[in-house]
Regions:
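A short beta-strand submotif of the Rossmann-like class I SAM-dependent methyltransferase core
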Residues: 120-124
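Class I SAM-dependent methyltransferase SAM/SAH-binding core
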Residues: 66-107
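A short glycine-rich, Lys/Arg-flanked "PGG" loop and its adjoining helix->strand segment in the class I
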Residues: 135-147
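A short acidic, Gly/Pro-enriched loop at the edge of an enzyme's catalytic core
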Residues: 106-118
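Conserved class I S-adenosyl-L-methionine
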Residues: 1-54, 56-65, 152-178
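A short His-aromatic
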Residues: 125-130
Length: 185
């Protein structure tokens, strides 16, 4: 791959710093292909009215993973995009024009009051300590949003599938087999 095809990643933490273990990242990548995820995100964003937003809206996606939400936004015509994730490996899979930040979403390195929209598509449930980490993350989101900005959140906490997964991984015998049950989610 040439240097021009590599994503632009601004590092705010050391490259070795990660939040996700390799088994979870592997499970995430097997769950659906990048193109399937992009199509899912386009459908979701369309359903929630993103086509009606100005195409020059400044949008940040936090917990962006491999950047497929950003690709969806690009395909929908948005041009001022930034993504934040703590996984260097996932960020390197992104193929688009957005600026990426290798950073902790509880300490967002983005400009105060600069974003029209902040998007989270399935990342908040990975915060290690609730509710403290959620509070810190939401404070950061409020700090970077413009006064009339929008925070768009999709979290899978109450889906039937995840309800079953959480019931299974909370079983003591499952914890003995695999202590990091989040990789199954």
């Amino acid at each position: 791959m040439s240097a021009s095809n590599r994503p632009r990643i601004v590092r705010h933490v050391e490259s070795g710093t990660t939040c996700c273990d390799p088994q979870w990242e592997a499970a995430y990548q097997r769950f659906e292909t990048p193109e399937e995820e992009v199509r899912k995100f386009i459908h979701r964003l369309t359903r929630f009215g993103f086509p009606n937003l100005p195409k020059d809206s400044r949008i940040a996606e936090i917990f962006c993973g491999r950047g497929n939400g950003l690709v969806a936004l690009e395909r929908m015509g948005f041009t001022h995009l930034e993504g934040v994730d703590l996984s260097d490996d996932l960020l390197h899979q992104y193929r688009g024009t957005a600026t990426l930040h290798l950073a902790d979403c509880m300490d967002l390195p983005l400009t105060d009051g600069a974003y029209d929209v902040v998007v989270v598509q399935g990342g908040l449930h990975h915060l290690p300590t609730l509710p403290q980490d959620l509070d810190r993350c939401l404070e950061c989101v409020m700090r970077i949003l413009k006064p009339q900005g929008t925070f768009f959140v999709v979290e899978p906490w109450s889906t039937p599938f995840l309800t079953m997964v959480h019931l299974i991984v909370e079983q003591p015998w499952m914890r003995k087999i695999y202590a990091k049950g989040d990789a199954l989610a």
